[in-house]
From Swiss-Prot:
It is found in: Cell inner membrane. Belongs to the Lgt family. It comes from the Bacteria. PANTHER family: PHOSPHATIDYLGLYCEROL--PROLIPOPROTEIN DIACYLGLYCERYL TRANSFERASE, PROLIPOPROTEIN DIACYLGLYCERYL TRANSFERASE. A 1,2-diacyl-sn-glycero-3-phospho-(1'-sn-glycerol) binds at residue 147. It is an enzyme of class 2 (transferase). The chain crosses the membrane at residues 64-84, 102-122, 126-146, 188-208, 212-232, 245-265. This is Phosphatidylglycerol--prolipoprotein diacylglyceryl transferase. It comes from Beijerinckia indica subsp. indica (strain ATCC 9039 / DSM 1715 / NCIMB 8712). Disulfide bonds: none annotated. Keywords: Cell inner membrane, Cell membrane, Membrane, Transferase, Transmembrane, Transmembrane helix. Its EC number is 2.5.1.145.
Amino acid sequence: MPLMLVYPAIDPVLVWLGPLPIRWYALAYIAGLLLGWAYARRLAAQPVLWGRRTPPSALEVDDLLVYAAMGVIIGGRLGYVVFYNADFYLEHPLESLSLWKGGMSFHGGLIGTALTIGLLAWRRSIPLAVLTDLAAAAVPIGLCLGRIANFIKPELWGRVADPDFVPFAMVFPGAGSLPRHPSQLYEAFFEGIVLFVILFIAIRLGALRRPGLVTGLFALGYGLARIGCEFFREPDAQLGFLFGGATMGMLLSLPLVLIGLFLVIRAASPKLETA
């Protein structure tokens, strides 16, 4: 019998405070926002990284946290409702408010955050690219923690894998008896750790001096990482494969790749150098 890893079966509830469950899933969102905020504050406090650009003040970074949190929660939920299960929520509209039952979309959260950051930029008269570059640098932190929470829950598991070739395949509770790719951990690594390192190095090499470059690198990097990981992730049961083996995650990530590529090419123009 081929060897395979045993799913650790971590309780999705970290602790009960009376009748209130404190779940890893919720803590991942909170920790992602707070750690991202702390990292953004650190970047904003280093003017040398920004060249002639004016970085946000500490108060503006605090505002960015609040606006980003609203965008993530509202956009993430609406994105899941619209992109992944519209038929169900049209029949049961009140269920769209049941956040505790799960169901969030990264792409929806990204759209929501882009809108709320745009609102903040307009209200505070801050160049939009200053805020998006700062936010993009911090997002991989939350992505990594969120994917680990998906693994603990467990949800969004991978496709069936042959343990002879994938020795780290495992059987997930609720996913049948066959071993599967731990695709949540693939995404935590590539969308979180690898992307964070790429952006960290780019920033140290002067990426924040070029408006939109960090934003573009994030969009391009995330889009490519997500499309790659989708080949190992089980499609959502209510959607399945859409056409030609494509999944909803792939289709939603393709525009990110194109937008990211455009922003990177645009930011590389000598006219945008602000060193």
